[in-house]
Swiss-Prot record:
Source species: Klebsiella pneumoniae subsp. pneumoniae (strain ATCC 700721 / MGH 78578)
Matches recorded under InterPro entries: Ac/propionate_kinase, Aliphatic_acid_kin_short-chain, Aliphatic_acid_kinase_CS, ATPase_NBD, Propionate_kinase_PduW
Protein name: Propionate kinase
Record's keyword terms, sorted: ATP-binding, Cytoplasm, Kinase, Nucleotide-binding, Transferase
Pfam families, A to Z: Acetate_kinase (PF00871)
Length: 404
């Protein structure tokens, strides 16, 4: 038996979606509604055979969801909306409460909205997406899949910041970690490709895109991750600084009179590859500039790799060794240069790349005699979301859901 599951990612002015046939994971359609709220919004819908794109005014998310559901039947992808068996929603922040994906009920929704103080840019619109689909598809079960849930297995030594205790106890300031759905998916896919239980492996997963995070996975569980209280921390990213000396911030307040909002803008949108190179936040553009002799661009690439290498090294020490290193995300999946820079001079760990395999982004790119496996795995958060819907919302389908 097959089930049609929707995976939804609602952004502040966008709605990203996939419709999958489960448990096979076959993609029936995917698309994006962007520039919601503007007179020239754009709706893109793709199947394996066709692509439709339309520019039109879309006033709000309610109109966007209505348009999407009408298109599914209007374009013949579904004969009826009753064919939809479940909807999974990506939610940025689950706090300490959600240690797994959760079946949506009124209480779940209220908690997602309460956690908006920890993710003010994401949780409110994630909750809005859930409410709209519940309103328009009232008979269809919904599941919330949290970016933070996979990291709820961290020990206190990994998640607690050395601040006065009350900042954790009263304000919830601690490491939460993000990209959890991606790290969970690629580590599970790695174990499947190796034919080894994930519980038997020590893995470091590098999700490298415009946002970047590194995750240590031991015994099938996240034991450390580079992003912390917010997705701004950790390694260097496209426009985000990652970790830096916290005293820089009050110093900038005194020196330049910057407000909290200006500091947030600086750290989140003006730093990282863009800030150091002065060229772009896109790794490919910085590569091109470095190849043309731009010294700051070359420095940005080196700094990017070194921050990741330092994080990987600390995780290897924490886990007592390494069995596999995973690269995923836009940079991790596509940049042989980034992978080579990160894996440089690691022969002493039993980790070495095969240059030819790395250049063609083979699934496994380690040298033949290397002890540590190095894998390039395309992430698929939507498939992971659909699996969680199968597992939690469709009891009759649990045995069909691929274990994750």
């Amino acid at each position: 038996m097959t089930y049609k599951i929707m995976a939804i990612n609602a952004g502040s002015s966008s709605l990203k979606f996939q419709l999958l046939n489960m448990p096979q994971g076959a993609l029936l359609c995917q698309g994006l509604i962007e520039r919601i709220g503007l007179p020239e919004a754009r709706f893109t819908l793709k199947t394996s055979a066709q692509k439709w794109q339309e520019t039109l005014p879309i006033a709000d998310h309610h109109e966007a969801v209505t348009l999407l559901l009408e298109a599914l039947t209007g374009r013949g992808i579904l004969s009826s909306l009753q064919e939809i068996d479940g909807v999974g929603h990506r939610v940025a922040h689950g706090g300490e409460r959600f240690k797994d994906a959760a079946l949506v009920c009124d209480d779940t929704l209220r908690e997602i909205e309460r956690l908006a103080e920890l993710a003010p840019l994401h949780n409110p619109v994630n909750a809005l997406g859930i409410r709209l689909f519940r309103q328009l598809l009232p008979a269809v079960p919904a599941v919330a899949v949290f970016d933070t849930a996979f990291h709820q297995t961290l020990a206190p030594e990994a998640w607690l910041y050395p601040l006065p205790w009350r900042y954790y106890a009263e304000l919830g300031i601690r490491r939460y970690g993000f990209h959890g759905t991606s790290h969970h998916y690629v580590s599970s896919a790695l174990a499947e490709k190796l034919g080894v239980p994930l519980s038997a492996l020590r893995v470091v997963s590098c999700h490298l895109g415009n946002g970047c995070s590194v995750c240590a996975i031991k015994g099938g569980q996240s034991v450390n991750t580079s992003m912390g209280f917010t997705p701004q921390s950790g390694v260097m990213m496209g426009t985000r600084s990652g970790d830096l000396d916290p005293s820089i911030l009050p110093w900038l307040v005194e020196k330049e009179g910057k407000s909290a909002q200006q500091l947030s803008q600086l750290l989140n949108n003006e730093s990282g590859l863009l800030g150091v190179s002065g060229v772009s936040s896109d790794y490919r553009d910085v590569e091109q500039a470095a190849d043309a002799g731009n010294e700051r661009a070359a420095l940005a690439l080196s700094l990017f790799a070194e921050r990741i290498r330092a994080t990987i090294g600390s995780y290897i020490m924490q886990m007592g060794g390494l069995d596999a290193l995973i690269f995923t995300g836009g940079i991790g999946e596509n940049s042989a240069r980034a992978r080579a820079a990160i894996c440089r001079n690691l022969h002493f760990l039993g980790l070495a790349l095969d240059d030819e395999k790395n250049q063609r982004s083979a699934t496994f790119i380690q040298a033949d005699n290397a002890l540590v496996k190095v894998a390039v795995i395309n992430t698929n958060e939507e498939l992971m979301i659909a699996r969680d819907v199968m597992r939690l919302a469709l009891p009759q389908a649990r045995e069909l859901a691929v274990s994750a």
